[in-house]
Amino acid sequence: MSRISRQAYADMFGPTVGDRVRLADTALWVEVEKDFTVYGEEVKFGGGKVIRDGMGQGQMLAAEAMDLVLTNALIIDHWGIVKADIGIKHGRIAVIGKAGNPDVQPGVNVPVGPGTEVIAAEGKIVTAGGVDSHIHFICPQQVDEALNSGVTTFIGGGTGPATGTNATTCTPGPWYLARMLQAADSLPINIGLLGKGNASRPEALREQIAAGAVGLKLHEDWGSTPAAIDCCLGVAEEMDIQVAIHTDTLNESGCIEDTLAAIGDRTIHTFHTEGAGGGHAPDIIRAAGQANVLPSSTNPTLPYTINTVDEHLDMLMVCHHLDPSIAEDVAFAESRIRRETIAAEDILHDMGAFAMTSSDSQAMGRVGEVVLRTWQVAHQMKLRRGPLAPDTYYSDNFRVKRYIAKYTINPALTHGIGHEVGSVEVGKLADLVLWSPAFFAVKPALVLKGGMIVTAPMGDINGSIPTPQPVHYRPMFGALGAARHATRMTFLPQAAMDRGLAEELNLRSLIGVVNGCRRVRKPDMVHNTLQPLIEVDAQTYQVRADGELLVCEPASELPLAQRYFLF
């Protein structure tokens, strides 16, 4: 039997079982757990390579073969870190296994035929497209920025750069919901809209859900009173949608105890649960320990650095329509920015108490940095806290699975769309992101949306090859014309489907129906299930989890930063 060195094999076909890969310039390493390919029967495209007629490519018709195969990919997902070929059919993940020609090769379950396209994923990492569950729809150009960062699904609300949208993630009322659903139909990203949940009577909330809202947002700027919270959650229980909440920073209508009492044992998604983005001062972070609370962070506080506090004050004044000449407005802003709770947030993420990360796009958050900042936290926590059991200093597989779940499967489960997106699993939309390991979490090699390339780095269009400088991200064919509608999904609640809303609005995109929102609990948050007793000292703001004081120094230097953004 012919043999080649492990290094030569990795150079040709990508890493295999036991090989380790560093994630960009972080301190994180992953080790390949399983290889679905067959040694000696690997498929690869190119001159003199395997995927040729009668060799790695068979004679089957399109109905029997894949539309697209990603060869020799290193998949990093919440369920594993494995090497495999990925078969895509009709825009969905069809098979994860061994590609090739079953007529002449053993073990093939990803058949390649004359109708099959190939993306070479040797030496590349493949992850699921990110799910950003805290979007202010302030401008449509956010979509380009998000796609170029590896995010393929938006959950949020808004109507453009209106004052209400600049502060709150709400698309209020049936008329605006209809217009935003029609606008979203032309954007090459999956979208679900949140309606305004601040009401003390249920009728106006029910009509928003029937008009297409997949969830309701309670925001203190509209009045997150106990009455509004109770009413909103009552409608959510009735109509199986999620509720997201930004609680009362000023504690005017009640404190954290009153909000938790109003919520009861009902599931709720708490936004920026640390509090700098808003919420009961100084102890909204306590909510992260509740079994029915699904806590997320927004990315400006992630990770805690020497610049975090200074940046937040200016952001807050703009986003919440505050006046720096009014003492009460300044006091409101300062009450939300606490070094101690921001530092504790990173540690609670590493412990698995905080389950999700998100952006808060253009409203105290950066839409293109959800993926990047999540991994910066993971890096910092490895440096500060060492390996997470059962990891060793040689690999960080468990920590990597915990952190990737925060912006993929967990927000998808939270908002009832986990059956369509959020992981690299058979049957789900082929929303996939390819990364060169050196650029992981920073700059994707290309992004697939529903099986088509939607964005990618591209060189000089008049060049004789695709790679001459200047290279920058450009929209691809998946972002154009009717291809958008065949590869993107609009999410709707069952109540909107029952009334035929998609047909009424002439929506041309794929439709996904949210379900199971009310059954999701903290134990369902993949790799992020911890429910500690969290205590905050009202005078010093020190945070303890199950009695442990949570403190860490701010970072003065980070990976995934200036090294990658000279241009």
Curated annotation (Swiss-Prot):
Name this polypeptide is given: Urease subunit alpha
Binding site residues for substrate: 219
GO BP terms, alphabetized: urea catabolic process
Pfam family, one: Amidohydro_1
Membership in a protein family: Belongs to the metallo-dependent hydrolases superfamily. Urease alpha subunit family.
Keyword annotations: Cytoplasm, Hydrolase, Metal-binding, Nickel
Cofactor note: Binds 2 nickel ions per subunit.
Gene giving rise to this polypeptide: ureC
